[in-house]
A protein has these predicted regions:
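Short, low-complexity disordered leader/linker segments with a strong preference
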Residues: 1-41, 116-121
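Hinge/cleft segment of the Venus flytrap/periplasmic-binding protein
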Residues: 8-13, 21-33, 187-188, 277-323
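Extracytoplasmic "Venus flytrap"
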Residues: 43-62, 66, 70, 74-92, ...
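An alpha-beta-alpha
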Residues: 48, 63, 151-194, 198-199, ...
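Short, solvent-exposed amphipathic alpha-helices that sit
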Residues: 55-72, 149-153, 176-194, 208, ...
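Hydrophobic alpha-helical segments within soluble ligand-binding/sensing domains
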Residues: 86, 142-166, 178-179, 208-210, ...
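Flexible loop/hinge segments that line or gate small-molecule binding clefts
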Residues: 100, 108-148, 159, 256-266, ...
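Hydrophobic alpha-helical
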Residues: 103-118, 184, 198, 203-262
């Protein structure tokens, strides 16, 4: 256990160093994948919520590999959780003449005007991982079943305890975060012994979740379980609890089943997580891009199923990689 904890802290230090590196290097990535470009090629642009999340890197690898294989052009922009920067980057891509926009909104309510402009220019719009407020603006929306992710974790949580004082770590600017939290809360409906004592906004980021939970601890908030909208938040929560010698007293539950969180599940430092499948989302997105470009009928809404990972089945999924 001690060696595993040392590895955990080393990984956390690296993770936070990477996060700070992104913050102080201009907040965004500019990538242009143009090798092997064919004549009369299509131009695909992508803007995810942040590239400070391995989930989006894996999803993007599936998409960019397909675009490169087709001989088309692909550009990536990273808004680094800045909604205004995301709008500016989409405007830049429209000026460059993209044919398809793949977007994960930083703020699900903020993109309506720029997406209307994109549609007016004939750009096909694919929304991934979380919804936009006006879903009529998207040609296709591809997400995990986020509500069910919260629901299955909530049901498992109830199997572990019927009385709890809960903190919920949120990201209110995203529909996916809202849906996961709502699914979890709905699973607890009617359980009088379960009390939500605080909701903490953490933007789904380790480096925000850790100090904000620390603030709640310092304020004397009494809690014995934490539900996190994603596992970047879960890792930050585990770090704060470990720092305060509280990890053996507090249960932690999340969504993602990232490699880090699966390692913590295996060590019984996280109770359970609903697994997302970024490779599947990426492949669905890549197929939808070319379906739209070829004029084929495509699905308006695609939900990628999630699965519950617990200490009992974590080895089936592997802890060294995303599923």
């Amino acid at each position: 256990m001690l060696n595993n904890k040392k590895l955990f802290w080393a990984a956390l230090i690296v993770l936070n160093s990477v996060a700070l590196g992104i913050l102080f290097s201009g907040y965004f990535i500019k990538a242009d994948y143009s090798l092997g470009q064919k004549e009369s090629s299509y131009f695909i642009g992508a803007s995810y919520m942040t590239m400070n999340n391995e989930f989006y890197k894996i999803m993007n690898e599936e998409i960019s590999a397909k675009v490169e294989a087709e001989g088309d052009r692909f550009i990536l922009r990273d808004p680094a959780l800045d909604a205004d920067r995301q709008k500016e980057q989409i405007e830049e891509m429209l000026q460059k003449g993209i044919d398809v926009l793949v977007v994960t909104p930083v703020d699900w309510e903020s993109l309506s005007l720029i997406l209307k402009k994109a549609k007016a220019q004939g750009v096909r719009i694919i929304v991934v991982d979380t919804n936009v407020y006006d879903e009529t603006l998207a040609d296709s929306t591809i997400t995990s079943d986020n509500y069910n992710a919260g629901m299955i974790v909530g049901k498992y949580f109830l199997e572990q305890c019927k009385e709890a004082e809960l903190i919920i770590m949120t990201h209110e600017a995203t529909k996916s975060g809202q849906d996961r939290v709502q699914g979890f809360i709905d699973a607890l409906s009617g359980e009088e012994g379960i009390k939500i004592v605080r909701r903490i906004e953490c933007e789904g980021q380790t480096e925000i979740a850790m100090p904000r939970l620390q603030e709640a601890i310092d304020e004397g908030v009494h809690f014995d379980n934490v539900f996190c909208l994603n596992d970047l938040a879960s890792v930050g929560v585990v770090a704060a609890l470990e720092d305060n010698h509280m990890l053996d007293q507090v249960g932690v539950y999340g969504v993602d089943a990232s490699p880090d969180s699966k390692a913590l599940i295996k060590e019984n430092m996280i109770g359970a997580s609903a697994a997302q499948f970024p490779s599947k989302i990426g492949r669905e997105t890549a197929d939808t891009i070319y379906g739209l470009l070829e004029g084929k009928e495509t699905e308006k809404n695609i939900l990628v199923p999630v699965e519950l990972i617990t200490p009992e089945n974590v080895d089936e999924f592997g802890i060294d990689r995303w599923q």
